[in-house]
Regions:
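Acidic/histidine-enriched, beta-strand-rich ligand/metal-binding domains
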Residues: 2-98
């Protein structure tokens, strides 16, 4: 894989997916913190668009290796922001994409 680790390659693919697949990929939600989310089963990546706050633009984060069961719990959660804070933020690798 051209000197890149498998994990690095998967992250690059997730990043490209996030850049190329805008509206159809993301599912909008009614939330005070989260605008939309999307999940890719093949590499277990969860994308989350957070709402803009004040003068700050909204941001997109990607969470890596989120198991399908955890994604199902996230979808069923009445508070997406609280779920991210308590179940994802300190347990999964993540990064800000924009």
């Amino acid at each position: 894989m051209l000197g890149i680790s498998e994990q690095g390659f998967r992250r690059l693919e997730a990043y490209k997916m996030a850049q190329l697949t805008e509206p159809a990929f993301m599912i909008p939600v009614e939330s005070s913190n989260v605008e939309a989310f999307g999940y890719v089963d093949e590499d277990q990546t969860l994308f989350v668009d957070f709402l803009a706050k004040g003068n700050s633009a909204g941001s997109r984060y990607v969470y890596y290796e989120v198991e399908p069961e955890v994604y199902s719990q996230f979808m069923a959660s009445p508070s997406k922001g609280s779920f991210i804070w308590t179940h994802l933020r300190d347990r999964y690798d993540y990064e800000k994409l924009r």
